[in-house]
């Protein structure tokens, strides 16, 4: 998977993803009544039973950075159709109920996958795996696996689907450990970080170990396409950190730069995992590409929302100091939009907050400028494109939950 080289500019917000020459995605033919799939794992010795795979017309992705799928404005679902903007809020527990059994099995397996050779690593794994994470990334693997399994006529999920979800969570966990070291973060999900408890050396080694262990399990999946996809993600993590470090306090950073960094650090893993889940279901390449587009745009939307929350939530809600990204010089979407209208904000950031209360003034300018509102529009736009990518799937509780994942993300701002 080649790293993206260019992204849609901020003017993309004003035109709501206008159409390229590509056709809109037609709805699939009504599928046979789906069977409720639960944890009946089958191995290589028991090949899955299939019906004839479904077919849908799709737009192939071009570059993974921003808008590889140009969707005609008329085909983007409105709030009534998608649930985005509807008053009823979604809880995490209700959102993930349809894959609760899958996640329970995953939770039971995670600690054993780390191994018991080193007590310090085991203790670090227990700390991070038990820190109250939502397991959204493996949940997305299970949701796409089950949605595409219904489309392909796969009667049961495979051990590859299960192991993929475990690998994705291990990679995500390793990246969090390293992120906390790089950012010198003292808290993660309301608990002390690994490097605070065990020191930087152990934290770095623990993250390295999890990357290595996940790579070993990945190789044992024996699917070269998936191995390439997930291996690229680990490279993207490093690229994202380097890009972020090279643009600290840089008021000339563009929205394209920000979205590329966000792809590397967040969306790459989600996009690769949703595409890999579809690959293991055995659906067509076109559908696998749409699952990639879903994951990529959902990942970008999630990152933009996270960056908005850094300005709108308290330290208690965030589990870290509010405005911490800005304080460290990491300029995110709300700041990039605000810089277009607030010259004083540039002066304050250029000074690296050297004067008393300058950070508080900068945060106030971001709020006053409308930067948060424009960032919200960006997050919503990416979410709508993600939902559009699901139209080649048959209607099911799993597709509905994938759509509701977009709604849940946007509700975090309200």
UniProtKB/Swiss-Prot annotation:
Biased composition (Pro residues): 24-35
EC identifiers of the protein: 2.5.1.84
Sequence positions that bind isopentenyl diphosphate: 134, 137, 172, 189
Record's catalysed reaction(s): 7 isopentenyl diphosphate + (2E)-geranyl diphosphate = all-trans-nonaprenyl diphosphate + 7 diphosphate
Any GO CC annotation of this UniProt entry: chloroplast
Compositionally biased region (Low complexity): 1-23
Transit peptide: 1-72
Region annotation (Disordered) ranges: 1-36
Binding site for Mg(2+) 2: 179, 183
List of residues binding an all-trans-polyprenyl diphosphate: 188, 265-266, 303, 320
Recorded family membership: Belongs to the FPP/GGPP synthase family.
Function: Involved in providing solanesyl diphosphate for plastoquinone-9 (PQ-9) formation.
Cited PANTHER family: GERANYLGERANYL PYROPHOSPHATE SYNTHASE, SOLANESYL-DIPHOSPHATE SYNTHASE 3, CHLOROPLASTIC-RELATED
NCBIfam families: prenyl_cyano (TIGR02749)
Name of the protein in its database record: Probable solanesyl-diphosphate synthase 3, chloroplastic
